[in-house]
Amino acid sequence: MDVEEVKAFRDRCSQCAAVSWGLTDEGKYYCTSCHNVTDRSEEVVSAADIPNTKINSINRGLRQRSKHEKGWDWYVCEGFQCILYHQAKALETLGVSPELKNEVLHNFWKRYLQKSKQAYCKNPVRTSGRKAKVLEDSVQSSDLGSDLELLSDTTCPLESEAEFQSDPQIPKPFPVTKGSPKSASVCSGSVDGVEYSERKEKGLVKMTVPRTLALCSLSLLWQRETITVSDLLRFVEEDHIPYINAFKLFPEEMKVYGRDKGIFAIESWPDYEDIYKNMIELAIFLDLPRFPDITEDCYLHPNTLCMKYLLEVNLPDEMHTLTCQVVKLTGIGEVDFLTFDPIAKTKRTVKYDVQAMAVIVVVLKLLFLLDDKLEWSYSDLAEAYNEQHREDTPQFDFRKWYQVMKKTFDEKRRKWEEARARYAWKTKRPLYRSHIDKSVAYKRRKMVENLQKQFSALVGSSPVVEKQAPSSFQFNWTEEGTDSPCFHGHSLQGLLIMKGQSMITKNSLYWLSTQKFCKSYCKHVTTYEESNFSLSYQFILNIFSFLLRIKTSALHEEVSLLEKKLFEKKYNESKKSSGSKKGRRH
């Protein structure tokens, strides 16, 4: 039956009053505007009997097949919705509470769809370029209170129950937007791929694949889960959380090509600073209220994280007492400082993992100075003591720790670099510019796979890289006398002295990582030039920054900011002296 014959049915739709009808596989009329199915039916004549006949029908519930790719008509937001769903499922597999997927991330995503005017509003922005008007009863940030409240599904329904249940491949916890009666664009597999790429509005934060990680990170922070941003990035690297080529998780009916490639194809690893900035941007864009308090019993509190990282970098447990003192003196353990509040004037989240590592660096400087001299002198004393007192608890030997860590770190970094070099960026589901290039793209992909097989046969079977099991720790330290000796139980006795009722460090000197902070518009408070610092300091920063998957300069900056809080008096005196010198020049 031709489309012209369907137009003979002139009744208005009971839902939207439109006169635009199609036929389902069962021969019933359905509205192409709102997908409402009527009780009226029409006998469908077999297309095999009438040549060159087109039947306007739908399959798999109410989803329409595209005439170009024989797939679904889908929107870009549905693609990101699918990625978020699988990321949330992966986090749940890693031990995160199911509430994160079913409640927190679900509500964040609904709120994003509303704020970006893609759903949960009267006229969502679609390919026609229509502007959406947010419902008048939409919840403002001031009305949220302590809990996150969003528009209910009944306020502005997006899909019928029949459509939602018709497709088991679509993630259930997220709302499914309706397909358009129009077929997919010849320039993209999605209906709105071209328009989405060109959409530019003031204040709009467009969803990207990196921002899906930022949204997951915000959800983890809201739930106060035991996964930091650095852990999230590491799990992405280890392929426990989908990110690179995440579009391969789309159902086969969701064709990805053309402009979709620039939206969903990622050819670089996620960056800590980018995720951090995206978290702040999304929180502000969504008008999120103050997050739940980060108290001392939370995993993200610096005291807890410092203990975790002391175990990670194989340092003595006794150092935890010193890290707690630094946290108390600097005030970074206060609830108001740790709790993220997007509504506050200083819209910034605390880099909890980086901050904890910075505390450990400061404690190491307090103990050993790290000037390439004092730490080795203390090591000689510790080595001599351990030789004479073999039965006693050994004193911490910085030199021995350095040698063990360097060997382990070099091996770990070598394997990490090899894994990155071997990573297959191309997927078996190739991307192509248009549906016309599909056959060429698949032929090229097949050719590449054949060449890889032939090359592997020539050089011999390549070792199969096993997927690492997820773990909170990257290093495994064993008992003394093995390749990776454990320093956790070693004593700081030779590094501390009794003064009155308390123990203080034997070393009374300290050098500041940054003498003067930058006040320019570059937004960097300090710079890091390796040649200006001792080799010991460089070594520690390199190891710690590698564990967090951040740049060395980022950790150095956090150390400098922490020192500014710890030695505020010293910084003020330095500032006054520089000001007086300027006065004498004039």
From Swiss-Prot:
Modified residues (N6-acetyllysine): 438
InterPro entries: Rrn7_cyclin_C (IPR048538), Rrn7_cyclin_N (IPR048540), TAF1B/Rrn7 (IPR033599), TF_Rrn7_Zf (IPR021752)
GO molecular function, one term: zinc ion binding
Tagged with keyword Chaperone: no
Residue span of region B-linker: 69-73
Subcellular location: Nucleus, Nucleolus
Region of interest: C-terminal cyclin fold: 260-370
Binding site for Zn(2+): 13, 16, 31, 34
Domain of life: Eukaryota
ZnF start-end (RRN7-type): 5-39
Keyword field: Acetylation, DNA-binding, Metal-binding, Nucleus, Transcription, Transcription regulation, Zinc, Zinc-finger
Entry text on domains: Although it shares weak sequence similarity with GTF2B/TFIIB, displays a similar subdomain organization as GTF2B/TFIIB, with a N-terminal zinc finger, a connecting region (composed of B-reader and B-linker regions), followed by 2 cyclin folds. The RRN7-type zinc finger plays an essential postrecruitment role in Pol I transcription at a step preceding synthesis of the first 40 nucleotides.
PANTHER family: TATA BOX-BINDING PROTEIN-ASSOCIATED FACTOR RNA POLYMERASE I SUBUNIT B
Record-given protein name: TATA box-binding protein-associated factor RNA polymerase I subunit B
Originating species: Mus musculus (Mouse)
